[in-house]
Amino acid sequence: MTGAPPYHPQSPTQQSHYAGYSPSNKPRHYYPNSEHYQQQPPQTPPAFPQPNLARSPHYSHAPSPLPGALPPLNGGAPTPAHPSDPSPQYQAHSAAGTPQYPLPRPYSGSLLPASGTSPYGPSTPSHAHPSSRPDSHAHVSPKKEPESHFAVNHGAPAYSVMREPQASPPKEAKPARAADPMSFASILSGPTEEQAPPKIQSPTPGLGTIHSAVPAANATSLNPPPASFHPKVGDIEPVPPVSAPRLEKKPSADKRQRNTEKEDLKSAENPTNGVTEPPKILRPPRRIMSEKETEMVNKYMVEIDNAEKSDVEAPGFEQERERYILKGKKRALDVERAESIRRKRRRHDYLLKLGKSFEKQANAGMDRFRYANEASVISEVQAKEIQDEKERKKDMQRKRRRENTVRMEMQKKLEAELKANETQDSAEKAKFLREAERAQRKIKTTKRALEGVTEPEEIGEITPLAPNLEGGITSSFHIGRSSPSRRKTGRGGPVTRPKKSKEQKQAEKDAAEAAYAAMENDEPLPLAPREDPRKESLKKDAKGGRSKEATPVPVSTYESKGYNQIYEQIWRDIARKDIPKVYRTKVNSLSTRQENLRKTAQLASKQSRKWQERTNKSMKDTQARAKRTMREMMSFWKRNEREERDLRRLAEKQELESAKRAEAEREANRQKRKLNFLISQTELYSHFIGRKIPGAGGESGDAGVQGTEAMDLTPGAGAKVTNFEDLDFDAEDDTALRQAAMANAQSAVQKAQERARAFDDPNKSTMDTMDDSELNFQNPTSLGDIEISQPTMLTAKLKEYQLKGLNWLVNLYEQGINGILADEMGLGKTIQSISVMAYLAEVHNIWGPFLVIAPASTLHNWQQEITKFVPNIKVLPYWGNAKDRKILRKFWDRKHITYTKESEFHVLVTSYQLVVLDAQYFQKVKWQYMILDEAQAIKSSQSSRWKSLLGFHCRNRLLLTGTPIQNNMQELWALLHFIMPTLFDSHDEFSEWFSKDIESHAQSNTKLNEDQLRRLHMILKPFMLRRVKKHVQQELGDKVEKDVFCDLTYRQRALYTNLRNRVSIMDLIEKAAVGDETDSTTLMNLVMQFRKVCNHPDLFERAETKSPFSLAHFAETASFNIKQSIEDDGAFSFLRFVDTSVGEAFNYSHQGVFERALRRRGQTNRLSRLSVVYDEDESSTATLPHTLFNIVDRNDRQAVYDIAVEGHMRELMNVSRSVFEQEGLNVIEPCAGPAASAPPITLVSSGQEALIETQDALFNVPVQHALFGTPSKAMEEQIIEQQLDPTPYSLPPMLPEPISTKGRYTHIEVPSMRRFVTDSGKLAKLDELLRELKAGGHRVLLYFQMTRMIDLMEEYLTYRNYKYCRLDGSTKLEDRRDTVADFQQRPDIFVFLLSTRAGGLGINLTAADTVIFYDSDWNPTIDSQAMDRAHRLGQTRQVTVYRLITRSTIEERIRKRALQKEEVQRVVISGGAAGGVDFNTRNRDSKTKDIAMWLADDEQAELIEQKEREALERGETFGASKGGKKNAQKRKRDVTLDDMYHEGEGNFDDASAKPSGAATPVSTAENIGTPSASTPVPKRGRGRGGKGTAKRAKTTKERLRLIDGDGGLGSG
């Protein structure tokens, strides 16, 4: 691995320990091509070079500024050490002109340690014991590369035990001294040369000492050693013999001789190149003494020689000397053993690195080959596919032509056979049969060609080369010519070979046999005489000549008719056939001759101009060659420069990648330590609070924090709070970080306590009465025995788990800690919150102010429950318009007010929207307790709602939520951040840990880290209390969930398939990877369209009313007022005789026949005697027996079948109609209707009478009422006002009943409700389900995602006569309470239609025992909240939940994703096992790609996953853009899944009365796949916020609509 670790485990002042390693210096000619960067074989080099090695300029290093820890063993001056730069790529070859990118070098400086100490550990004096460590890699990060030894060991001499393991015996290693060691001659003379090592590697050891004198002198002059290390004359002691080979190592002689001048210059510049020689060797040359000085020296020497001898060499130290020698040998063996281990490790590391290098190069070669040949292979495959397609098309055309040929030839054959059968002439019949046979052969060959069978060639003797039927080897093949045609020559054509007679063939055969026999007998062959054939030929010529001569023939007068016909036929054949052939032949011959002449002329002209070309050819060739050479040279240099540039860029790219990789590793380690610090700090805080609050563990009652109990939680005396940004995660160790986390946690808890005490009244605060020891976090059990009873002012009886929750909330309040009450929905979070307020008022006399913020649909519920359960607490409902709220603020808009029992209000209840609107007023009040109901509304820490609520002055905050995790773990982290903003800061690392390691696990199909889950639960326990129904509420009924799968109907399947075929899933995924807003919006809209089709096709395309086409014009309104006047002039005196008044006569004269018949209707006639026959006694019009002889009115004459009351005779006269009605044919919908209808005939007249009569007939209102039996509106009002019996005024219609009750009198077809139900698979299944539930006495909550679907459901429920009520986002706040109350109190309401978002929060609907989700939400917690409206406290029956899912559609994939989210919530909150969870979800950055995958079917999904794997193997990102401006577009606000599934439904938790907007506009078949009307469409034109689009021409359809006056064209 490359790169250095981000930190060192030891202190900065401590010396680093690295492995000592020095390769042998091979001569430069050893390397291939005399290049010192060539890769070396993986062999183990010699252990150590000479300690005074003078490096070549190619291997020079910068001097180190740090001195060694200890001086050298030989007393020399300490040399500077090399700086410990963690980046190995900047250490090696800094002074040489080497390339600036790393090359593979096995023994270069980048592989060796960079410390300033000895390679064996810390520097020790020569008499100390060696280090006890077996190797020096114990404290080095395994990710750090070994660094160069040459950059390290400049001053400290290295042991040479590994090079020369056999130490010389002590007697041989003893230095040779003078006879008297204390004499001046021995002192002033030069030091005796130490024993040279064995001459194994250096044949000329003397050169090293001679050569190294100059650089050592320079080193002394440039860097003088400290004064404490200057040797004195009296301090010189004999050097131990064992240390001699360890101090010095002679360099190679041949290398010294080759680089003498370079080394001198380099040593002058860099005194630390190599190992500094001891001072006794590096002294300047002696000065020549004068005679006087010499005499003085000799004098003193004589005095010293004559002085008394000392006992330095006296015996008695043999044991110490032996012990010293044994220690030296032991130390040498230890060093040898340690070096052997290091050598093996270096060899292993080097082999691993070499293997990785080979693998990298192999992969790079594979990539280069793929990059170079991929395009050509793709183009070749594409070309082959195109060619194959062309061949296929040709084959199809050829096949069709052959089939047509077979069909035509078969027709010809049949015609020929028919003609042959019909004709009587034998010649004609033979001709037709030949044609039939020819057609049959052609059919046969064509069929063989169709079947792919070729006709085998017949073997014959007429081929150019006869077949070899007798075996043997054929020496040649006839390739030049094709096989001769088997066609016969035409009639009259030349015969290629004359036919022989049988006699000639027999004669030739006999001659051949005779010749063969003669050859076998070696006899001369009998040759036929030449004269005989010649004579025979002459005779034949003579006969022919005589026959051709014009012999005079006597004229015969006889002429035969057949002769003349034959003669004329011959001439006709010649004129018709032969002459055109000869003509064509002559014309072809002439054209060929002319073409040859033209070519000859051209060749001749070229030949004649050759002498001109020959003169200028040399000059032109020279210029051409020069230009060609120049072009080739330019192309060569360009190619060479391009290759060099590419190689340089590649090297730079590799260097940058390696640097980035190293930096990424360092940053990863740093982030890991930072995350560990954050988690440790949080769990320590949670641990302190958990031990303070006994009920923090919920109902589980476990041991809490097990791992933390065992730790020493006592912070040090000097522990102080450290800011997160000030921590150095690279240098600090785990212990220091642990102490810092503990101090920060302690400080956070103490600040929370102090803030709570500062908020309370000092005179009434309970915190002041506590002992100071209670704030000591080492004794947090003082509050463990506090038990709180139920407040007396609370009228309800709390359950056991609710009382436990009250204890937990009170302890949180007294500690000043905020919390999350996350009990499952329906367990009474509201009553627990109310009980806390009652406890504070009763025990601590804290009457407020309390602030309750809830969704708009639950505001009335909060007000009612507080008033019901705690009547002493006054509630102020804060909602309404701005004027109303201003009046309400007069009650609490005071800065300094003390709330008592007599205050005007104690609790203020409002909604989230109003809190944000009036945030400036809420911030002025100091609230004792702020309770947020349905706290998932503040799940985003970036929203203005979250920031506004966080700025309120509150002593404590309490969050109520039944679903703390809805979509991801970041929402839970936002809630924790809200309750403790100082501790749970919004660190990106912590948020990333929550999302990456738990929500969407990075590794495929792996279990969650149990330690991380344990730590997460430990963090959550003190701040969150959660209980589920099945654990704490036994009397609550069970909840059963059932998934009901429905199939797509024919209409749905057609729409679904058509919609999916019109979009390309691959294109959508590729565009989604780019992240363009337009493509994302299109994808969201597509998902919405698919959901519409699954719910009901009428959402996508509503069924239309059909009617025949008619060209008539129908008037909309018509009213006619005709003034009638009656003239009483006495002209109607005759009317008295006809029992008619003047008015009646006037009416009769102005009314038509139908009106007069209508007036007569209902009046009895005088002739009514026949009515007595069939009268019944019970009838009101019956004639009594004693009145039969009275004179009464008679009935009109009627037919017999009309008189009978029972109507049996009428049925006999209308048998067909009766059967039609009894069979039910009259209620069947008509299966067909006329395509067009004729308008009524229009009369055209010059006068007004015809017009008046027509209008009077068409628009006569009384006539219409009489025909259809519908009284006028005024009459109905009078009947109701006067309270009259409507029977006399509601006469039966005079128009007979239509035959079809569905079709009625017209052919207008209204969409059938029965078909409306059966068009949707979900609605058909729901129809069956509701019928069963209605029969069983159940009541239903029906949830929808789209309010448009609720509109359609209202039509269905009206059709089925089910009583229902409705609540969605458009329902006003004041209507919601009444609607819920109606459903709860009226059992006759069967169905409650609700929107999932509007009707799923905070309302109590326990009157229903059945919940049906028509379409599920992608967020499972929303559905859980909705179903818990019925499954909550107060529900005594079992709750059944039905979820309608359309099979094999997008809904199945959405449901699968929702189940994964449910599993995340179960694992994190409930603490369940994570074995069955598939956390292998996609990357969070590619959510749009996941949505696009929902649209694909199984085959497409498998294909997409395969392409993703292939792209991953190539190192690319599937669907990523290749470049372009599209990636640079600025992204606008993202369209989320929430917006997609609930488009236009409005804000359900707002108090606005705006319509939901979810009534999705009806789409037609022409705009499938286009954005719906709910998606904002950019305006057209410039300067209006949209792109300027060109004005397109109108289509023919649009022009016709414009001419017809149909209105808008759709585009506005």
Curated annotation (Swiss-Prot):
- List the GO biological process terms: CENP-A containing chromatin assembly; chromatin remodeling; DNA repair; positive regulation of transcription by RNA polymerase II; regulation of TOR signaling; subtelomeric heterochromatin formation; telomere maintenance via recombination; transcription by RNA polymerase II
Look up the EC number in the record and give it: 3.6.4.-
List, as start-end ranges, the regions of compositional bias called Basic and acidic residues. Answer: 132-148, 246-267, 501-512, 529-549, 610-624, 1534-1545, 1595-1604
Q: Which sites bind ATP? A: D823, E824, M825, G826, L827, G828, K829, T830
Keyword Magnesium set for record: no
Residues of the region (Disordered) are 1-288, 387-409, 438-554, 607-626, 1513-1612
Q: What are the GO MF terms of this UniProt record?
A: ATP binding; ATP hydrolysis activity; ATP-dependent chromatin remodeler activity; DNA binding; histone binding
Q: Where in the cell is it found?
A: Nucleus
Quote the biased-composition stretches of kind Low complexity, using this chain's numbering.
113-126
Primary localization class, coarse:
nucleus
Swiss-Prot/TrEMBL catalytic activity: ATP + H2O = ADP + phosphate + H(+)
Compositional bias segments (type: Basic residues): 1523-1533, 1579-1594
Domain DBINO intervals: 570-695
- Composition bias type Polar residues, residue spans: 10-25, 1561-1575
Q: Which UniProt keywords apply?
A: Activator, ATP-binding, Coiled coil, DNA damage, DNA repair, DNA-binding, Hydrolase, Nucleotide-binding, Nucleus, Transcription, Transcription regulation
Sequence motif DEAQ box, residues? 933-936
Assigned GO CC terms: chromosome, centromeric region; chromosome, telomeric region; Ino80 complex
Give the quaternary structure: Component of the INO80 chromatin-remodeling complex.
Q: What is known of its domains?
A: The DBINO region is involved in binding to DNA.
Recorded family membership:
Belongs to the SNF2/RAD54 helicase family.
Q: What does this protein's UniProt record list under function?
A: ATPase component of the INO80 complex which remodels chromatin by shifting nucleosomes and is involved in DNA repair.
Protein name, entry field: Chromatin-remodeling ATPase INO80
Q: Which gene encodes it?
A: ino80
